[in-house]
Structures are given as C-alpha cells and as structure tokens.
Amino acid sequence: MKLVYLVLGAVALLLLGGPDSVLSSSSGNLHTFVGCAVREFTFMAKKPGCRGLRITTDACWGRCETWEKPILEPPYIEAYHRVCTYNETRQVTVKLPNCAPGVDPFYTYPMAVRCDCGACSTATTECETI
C-alpha cells in the first residue's frame, strides 16, 4: 500500500512541476538522484584552423546501480556495473567562426535524445577502468 502512495506522489510531482522539477539544478536533488537522464551540457567546439565556439547541448548524466560481491569459485567476484550511457542520439552540425581558407568550417557532434543505465559501450561512451 505504501508503494502506491510513493508512485502517486512521484506522478503528482511530475504533473505539477514537470520533469525538470524532479531533476533540477538544486544540489539536493542532484546529489541523491540515482538513474540516467538527459541534461544540458556546455563545451567548447574546437578544430585546427578555426576559432572555438561555445555550444550548449543535451548529454547523458547520472549514477547507475553498480555492485560487486565475492564468490567462492573463479573469478572469485560477481560484478554488476552499469553506466549512464546514450540510448538515442541526434547528430547536430554547426559552422565554426573565422576558419582559415581551405579549412572545413563544419563541426558535427551528438546530442542526447534518450539515456539509460546500461553496460558501457565504447561505440558511444568513454569507458575507463582504474
């Protein structure tokens, strides 16, 4: 019964404030948020022979459930690692300013449409291990 009230409360919050109110920029929500969401991101697009251009786009952001536990048989550990990764993207092309003659002024980058927690894929995500 308590789960029903929790779900109804979340739906009411979404209806009253929209999805941005749930994942707002207030530090409290961002520090406790577990999951993967599309969020605004700003970076400097650069290319040799052109001036840089500050771009604001959508990117994937979040924390996903991950755990490891020891087991008695090799490899002696069971691991479950998920990362916030791109599920769907759209390619966006912009024209960089003041490019030198002969330099292609166009710069293409991915914009996140949908993000999910999943296994890290080097095709869409920079996967690093320590």
From Swiss-Prot:
A Gene Ontology biological process term: regulation of thyroid hormone receptor signaling pathway
GO cellular component, as recorded: extracellular region
Location within or outside the cell: Secreted
Annotated keywords: Disulfide bond, Glycoprotein, Hormone, Secreted, Signal
S-S bonds: 36-84, 50-99, 60-115, 64-117, 120-127
Glycosylated position list: 87
Keyword Transcription regulation: no
Gene3D superfamilies per UniProt: Cystine-knot cytokines (2.10.90.10)
Keyword Signal: yes
GO terms assigned for molecular function: hormone activity; protein heterodimerization activity; thyrotropin-releasing hormone receptor binding
UniProt PTM comment: N-glycosylated.
Its biological purpose: Functions as a heterodimeric glycoprotein hormone with GPHA2 able to bind and activate the thyroid-stimulating hormone receptor (TSHR), leading to increased cAMP production. Plays a central role in controlling thyroid cell metabolism.
Additional free-text comment from the UniProt record: Overexpression of Gphb5 results in proptosis, elevated serum T4 levels and significantly reduced body weight.
Subunit structure and binding partners: Heterodimer with GPHA2; this heterodimer interacts with thyroid-stimulating hormone receptor (TSHR), and hence stimulates cAMP production.
Family to which this protein belongs: Belongs to the glycoprotein hormones subunit beta family.
Name of protein: Glycoprotein hormone beta-5
UniProt source species: Mus musculus
